[in-house]
A protein has these predicted regions:
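Glycine-rich phosphate-binding loops at beta-strand->alpha-helix junctions
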Residues: 31-34, 162, 175-203, 214-215, ...
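Adenine-nucleotide phosphate-binding core of ATP-dependent small-molecule kinases
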Residues: 140-169
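Short glycine-rich phosphate-binding loop at a beta-alpha junction
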Residues: 22-32, 178-189, 207-210, 320-324, ...
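Phosphate/pyrophosphate-binding loops at sites that engage ATP/ADP/AMP, CoA/4′-phosphopantetheine
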Residues: 12-26, 167-180
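An N-terminal assembly and electron-transfer interface module characteristic of large anaerobic redox
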Residues: 9, 95-103, 110, 213, ...
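Conserved phosphate-binding catalytic cores of ATP/NTP-utilizing and phosphoryl-transfer enzymes
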Residues: 11-12, 35-72, 77-85, 175, ...
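Conserved ATP-utilizing enzyme core subdomain
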Residues: 97, 104, 108, 113-146, ...
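Short glycine-rich, Thr/Ser-proximal phosphate-binding strand/loop in the N-terminal lobe
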Residues: 1-15, 88-95
Length: 640
């Protein structure tokens, strides 16, 4: 559809009307990536997230299905089914390697069309072992296989096996085929490929059902959903445009930048012939309703408000700059109180923005760092342009000990990124940049270190007694700050329950509160009608418990504790935010998933970086809410 599905769909709808004069359409449901646009453009009745559409279709063909796998051209969806409801959803993340386009690309590179290439794979006598790595590595593996004299048949079969192994062991991360189930429906256009189908059956050790409309299962599921909804509502006629209206249909598209808030979203405004408009690209409802988002049940917004209250207080000793990034999203109250008590005016860098990120981009030494770390370069750049006596960003190996883990480290990036900044930011030359190694986990040692080692290097005339008083103020401010978060979290939970709303623990690190890092995902959740709390607002409700991994980081100990607590609350679910490039999260995601699944909860992971398109994020969130609704419906039916 070349990025615009409307002309194509209009053409097909007119064709249907012309071939079936007098046809009465009972209901129309849209699904897929263009769902909202198509629904609004043609006044369709319902919209359905594609994951649920595929699930609905699969259940029609096999009512007792326990596993569904859908491999399309660019994405992959897998569902584990228990007691007739979705118990787990797996979606591929940023990379589309191992999907249909992956096979098509290789077929074309080898001089075949994809159907011919697939057919050859069925006659392989010795499929090449190409592993299940990404396309870049696979390219070199295929070339090596050709050099070794492998036939096209064996290469085709090897690639089909790779697609299957990628799905099973990289996306789903199954330890064995048996754990997935025995009653399996496969769908998606990729399964029209007979070699992929056969490879899947051989790997799983069972025969599976592939409907002859495998590539249209989403559309079929949407139709079944529409049928059910119209029957429930006793509707016999759809609200969709008539033939005459379709013939007059026009669409004008304009791209504008929203000035409603600091997000400056790039909006796409579709205007239709009858004057209606459809706006996309917005992270909140303000461009549509003219009203700001309701943040009364959003703890992320509350935490942002708390941090905004820390303004500079004029002091006798000068000014200190603190970058509002990484660990300072939690420790700003501590360091603000410490330096203010010592007589310094504490200035923070501006709130993160796209412009601030781009301003510091030239000094980022490695693209493998997580986005929050990359942002810190922009914060340092901003501070360097302010008239400050010093910039303060200490190295902190340890975090506070909350008694939840085996140790209480900061991750290497949070702990030591000041070293990277000192070595790569030329704007710090000639500036007083304080990035000494400090530990706040031992109050007595902290006072001694600051009074005897750190402060004398940069400032004179500060006594140990003053440092002790400043430290006391800092610890008290930090405790008060964390207490406010826990109290507000409790208030939000109580109010959400009073209103009958779902509660989502949007769990990550303190710096995921940064709007430029989370891209407004908290608002996306509240727009779905749920309340948002954070992992640090509920982690104190759980005692230390055994984990499958070494539990040695403060932030991650909270994450595990929050996941554990969620399993005890019927109306609470956890969504984990993960920054691309985070090595530690390779461990935490599996552990968090395990904790939630053992407690009968769904696990949802959202990977985020500098890319602001939330289309895939919205699909995951809608899939979560739809799966939870499905569970409730199944439970209610059983209770009856």
């Amino acid at each position: 559809n070349l990025g615009n599905p409307l002309p194509l769909i209009r053409e097909q709808l007119l064709k249907i009307y012309k071939e079936h004069p007098g046809l009465q359409v009972a209901s129309v449901t849209t699904t897929g990536y263009g769902e909202d646009l198509v629904k609004n453009a043609f006044r369709c009745d319902y919209g359905l997230v594609e994951t649920v559409a595929h699930f609905t279709a699969a259940k029609y063909f096999m009512p007792d299905v326990d596993f569904i796998i859908d491999i399309g051209g660019q994405d992959m969806k897998c569902f584990k089914i228990e007691d007739g409801a979705i118990s787990n959803i797996f979606l591929n993340e940023a990379c589309s390697s191992g999907c249909g386009s992956f096979l098509q690309t290789f077929a074309q590179a080898l001089g075949y069309d994809v159907k011919q290439f697939a057919a050859l794979g069925l006659f392989a006598d010795r499929p090449v072992d190409l592993g299940s790595r990404c396309t870049v590595f696979m390219n070199s593996s295929v070339k090596q296989a050709q050099k070794d004299g492998a036939s096209i048949e064996n290469i085709s079969a090897g690639l089909s096996i790779s697609v299957v192994k990628n799905a099973l062991y990289k996306v789903i991360r199954a330890s064995s085929p048996e754990e997935l189930g025995r009653k399996i429906v496969v769908q998606g256009g990729t399964f029209y490929n007979e070699a992929v189908l056969r490879a899947f059956e051989k790997e799983m050790g069972v025969e599976v059902i592939r409907p002859d409309i495998a590539g249209l299962m989403g559309a079929y599921g949407a139709a079944l959903f529409g049928l059910r909804q119209s029957q429930k509502a006793h509707k016999t006629a759809s609200a969709m445009m008539s033939q005459k209206e379709l013939e007059k249909f026009e669409q004008k598209v304009v791209s504008v930048k929203c000035g409603g808030c600091g997000n400056h979203c790039q909006l796409t405004v579709n205007t239709f012939a009858d004057g209606r408009k459809y706006i996309s690209g917005n992270r909140c409802d303000k461009p549509v309703t003219g009203k700001s988002a309701d943040d009364s049940l959003n703890l992320y917004a509350y935490k942002q408000q708390l941090l905004a209250e820390y303004k500079p207080v004029a002091g006798k000793r000068g000014s200190i700059g603190i970058p509002l990034c990484l660990g300072f999203y939690e420790l700003l109250p501590f360091w603000w109180a410490f330096w203010t008590k010592l007589g310094f005016a504490v200035h923070t860098s501006p709130v993160s923005s796209r412009g601030l990120y781009l301003a510091g981009q030239a000094t980022i030494p490695s693209d493998t760092a997580c986005f929050p770390a990359k942002l810190s370069h922009g914060h340092i750049k901003a501070l360097s342009q302010m008239q400050l006596d010093a910039i303060f960003y200490p190295c902190l190996t340890y975090n506070v000990d909350e008694g939840l883990g085996d140790n209480h480290y900061n991750c290497p990036v949070v702990a030591y990124y000041p070293e990277v900044l000192a070595g790569n930011c030329p704007e710090l030359e000639g500036k007083k940049f304080i990035y000494d190694y400090v530990g706040i986990h031992r109050p007595k040692d902290f006072v001694h270190k600051m009074a005897k080692d750190v402060l004398p290097k940069y400032f004179g005339g500060i006594s140990e007694r003053e440092v002790q008083a400043a430290a006391d103020a800092a610890y008290a401010e930090y405790e008060a700050h964390m207490a406010k978060i826990r109290v507000k979290g409790s208030e939000i939970i109580d109010e959400a329950r009073r209103q009958g709303k779902r509660i989502i623990v949007l769990a990550g690190r303190p710096y995921h509160v940064d709007p430029e890092v989370n891209h407004g995902i908290d608002h996306l959740i509240t727009r779905h009608g749920a309340a948002v709390v954070t992992e640090d607002s509920i982690s104190n409700r759980v005692q230390k418990f055994p984990t499958s991994v070494l539990n040695q980081w403060t932030y991650h100990s909270r994450l595990y504790a929050a996941a554990k607590y969620c399993t005890t609350q019927k109306d609470m679910d956890l969504v984990q935010l993960v920054s691309f490039g985070c090595g530690v999260d390779a461990i935490t995601t599996d552990e968090t998933r395990e904790i939630l699944q053992e407690g009968g909860k769904l696990y949802t992971q959202l990977k985020i970086d500098e890319i602001t398109n939330l289309g895939a994020v919205n699909i995951r969130l809608r899939s979560l809410f739809a799966a939870l609704d499905e569970r409730d419906e199944v439970a209610a039916e059983k209770a009856e």
